[in-house]
């Protein structure tokens, strides 16, 4: 199994090969996911909810992400490792550079930021200085209070066009990957077709180049609200590694996400 890079994912896109991503926060789970063939691992600020017990992702700090990035890095050999930049850690280009450097030194191969046009300067700056960027559009959880909750984005024509325009602009600024979350499947398809960089979906239909889920949802250990776009693979397989393989297989075959996991 060869090491996954952003170039690998571009090749997958060109060949029409679907790829998979999961969140990970420690060496043991990361090692299991890596060895079973998960292409991308994200040290997500979702840890604020699934690990720390908060109601949203806002309390997560750069130190939190850096610590868990170091843990995950020690457990993997092949997967591309992305680290989330948490709330208010990239409000200015200067702040972005300092905090992104911290996460790269902790072992990340790429950093992820949430937002559109206001991030273009920072994305270009990071890229020019050797820090790869994954952008994130649609439902951006750090903006949950602006949205008035965890709501599907891009359902009306104006917002759909805005998200598409932002996706193109972020690619032009140098973003190497894009995550789209909780947007209509038709919009996700249009974005995927419009960009040359790989697009990873979560709650965005089956036409994106890859899929990502939170590991706690895949393993059925999330408490409280269970997102519509998630699927408990452990329930159908009974074993963690088998659950991961089932997720990989269903994405590759176009079975997941199904209509029941998709927004229109």
From Swiss-Prot:
Per the record, its GO cellular-component terms are: cytoplasm
What Gene3D superfamilies does the annotation carry?
Phosphoenolpyruvate-binding domains
Q: Which UniProt keywords apply?
A: Cytoplasm, Magnesium, Metal-binding, Pantothenate biosynthesis, Transferase
Write down the chemical reaction(s) this protein catalyses: 3-methyl-2-oxobutanoate + (6R)-5,10-methylene-5,6,7,8-tetrahydrofolate + H2O = 2-dehydropantoate + (6S)-5,6,7,8-tetrahydrofolate
Q: Name one GO biological process term.
A: pantothenate biosynthetic process
Where is this chain's protein located in or outside the cell?
Cytoplasm
One Pfam family, short name please? Pantoate_transf
Tell me which SUPFAM superfamilies the record gives. Phosphoenolpyruvate/pyruvate domain
**What pathway, per the record?**
Cofactor biosynthesis; (R)-pantothenate biosynthesis; (R)-pantoate from 3-methyl-2-oxobutanoate: step 1/2
Question: Could you confirm whether the keyword Transferase appears in this record?
Answer: yes
Entry's cofactor comment: Binds 1 Mg(2+) ion per subunit.
Q: Where does Mg(2+) bind?
A: 45, 84, 114
Drop me one GO molecular function for this one. Answer: magnesium ion binding
Tell me the cofactors it needs: Mg(2+)
The set of disulfide-linked cysteines is: none
Active site annotation, chain numbering: 181
Under Enzyme Commission nomenclature, its number is: 2.1.2.11
Membrane-crossing segments per the record: none
Which residues does the record give as 3-methyl-2-oxobutanoate binding sites? 45-46, 84, 112
As for what it does, the entry says: Catalyzes the reversible reaction in which hydroxymethyl group from 5,10-methylenetetrahydrofolate is transferred onto alpha-ketoisovalerate to form ketopantoate.
Q: Describe, as the record does, how this protein assembles with itself and its partners.
A: Homodecamer; pentamer of dimers.
Q: Which family does it belong to?
A: Belongs to the PanB family.
In its UniProt entry, what is this protein called? Answer: 3-methyl-2-oxobutanoate hydroxymethyltransferase
Q: What is the lineage of its organism?
A: Bacteria, Pseudomonadati, Pseudomonadota, Gammaproteobacteria, Alteromonadales
């Amino acid at each position: 199994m060869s090491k996954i890079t952003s170039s690998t994912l571009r090749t997958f896109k060109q060949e029409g090969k679907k790829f998979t991503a999961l969140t990970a926060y420690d060496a043991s789970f990361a090692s299991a996911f890596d060895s079973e063939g998960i292409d991308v691992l994200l040290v997500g600020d979702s840890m604020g909810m699934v690990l720390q017990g908060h109601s949203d992702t806002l309390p997560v700090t750069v130190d939190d992400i850096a610590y868990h990035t170091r843990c995950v890095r020690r457990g993997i050999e092949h997967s591309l490792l992305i680290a989330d930049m948490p709330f208010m850690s990239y409000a200015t280009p200067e702040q972005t550079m300092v905090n992104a450097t911290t996460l790269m030194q902790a072992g990340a191969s790429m950093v992820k930021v949430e937002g559109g046009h206001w991030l273009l300067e920072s994305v270009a700056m990071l890229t020019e200085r050797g820090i790869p960027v994954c952008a994130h559009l649609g439902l951006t959880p750090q903006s949950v209070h602006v949205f008035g909750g965890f709501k599907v984005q891009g359902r009306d024509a104006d917002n759909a066009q805005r998200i598409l325009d932002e996706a193109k602009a972020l690619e032009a600024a140098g973003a190497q990957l894009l995550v789209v979350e909780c947007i209509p499947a038709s919009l996700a398809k249009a974005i995927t077709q419009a960009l040359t960089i790989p697009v990873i979906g979560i709650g965005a239909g089956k036409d994106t180049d890859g899929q990502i889920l939170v590991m706690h949802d895949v393993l059925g250990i999330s408490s409280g609200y269970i997102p519509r776009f998630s699927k408990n693979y452990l329930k159908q397989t009974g074993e963690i590694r088998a659950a991961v393989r089932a997720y990989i297989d269903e994405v590759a075959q176009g079975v997941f996400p199904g209509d029941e996991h998709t927004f229109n």
